[in-house]
């Protein structure tokens, strides 16, 4: 779905960052959209990623990769049309790479964290900002929750159609996520 960007972070300090693999059992990423017939949802089932921490255990690098063919709606025809819209043979992954992070405290436990980075989606790369709620869990893991609205056409995707064009998918989608990195 997205081209894998070979450099995790553009600065040398990030390349020296401690890297923590994502815990897939508690990674949840869903795509929600609409059509002229009904709303639809797809769940990502193959998610990988890394979290980079500086010497103060603060986040300074994030890379998340989703296999396009792991997006499942429960409807094989819709799944196939989605994979075609992503041109999955050329763009097998969706990738988000952090370039900037800002944080403000919401409570003793939660912080509002704005993640800015490059999202590679169907072969196009766009800079996006995502507002998340983040926290360090009691076990020392890093949890980020949030959602981000996107338009398929911003990534040069043609929203899928079915039944000879009578069923049309809306351009807007929302990606919802709850991702925990092992600390």
Predicted feature descriptions by range:
Residues 1-21:
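Bacterial Sec-dependent N-terminal signal peptides
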Residues 17-183:
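Low-complexity, acidic/polar, glycine-enriched regions of mature
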């Amino acid at each position: 779905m997205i081209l894998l960007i070979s450099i995790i972070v553009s600065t040398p300090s990030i390349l020296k960052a401690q890297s923590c693999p994502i815990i897939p059992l508690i990674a949840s990423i869903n795509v929600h959209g609409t059509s002229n017939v009904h709303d639809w949802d797809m769940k990502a089932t193959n998610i990988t990623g890394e979290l980079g921490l500086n010497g103060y255990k603060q986040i300074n690098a994030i890379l998340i990769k989703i296999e396009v063919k792991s997006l499942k709606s429960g409807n094989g025809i819709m799944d196939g049309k989605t994979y075609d819209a992503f041109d999955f043979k050329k763009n097998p992954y969706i990738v988000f790479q952090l370039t900037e992070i800002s944080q403000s405290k919401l409570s003793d436990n939660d912080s509002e964290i704005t993640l800015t980075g490059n999202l590679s989606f169907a072969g196009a790369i766009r800079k996006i900002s995502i507002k998340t709620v983040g926290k360090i869990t009691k076990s020392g893991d890093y949890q980020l929750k949030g959602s981000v609205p996107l338009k398929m056409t911003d990534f040069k995707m043609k929203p899928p159609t079915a039944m000879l064009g009578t069923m049309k998918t809306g351009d807007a989608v929302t990606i919802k996520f709850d991702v925990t990195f092992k600390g």
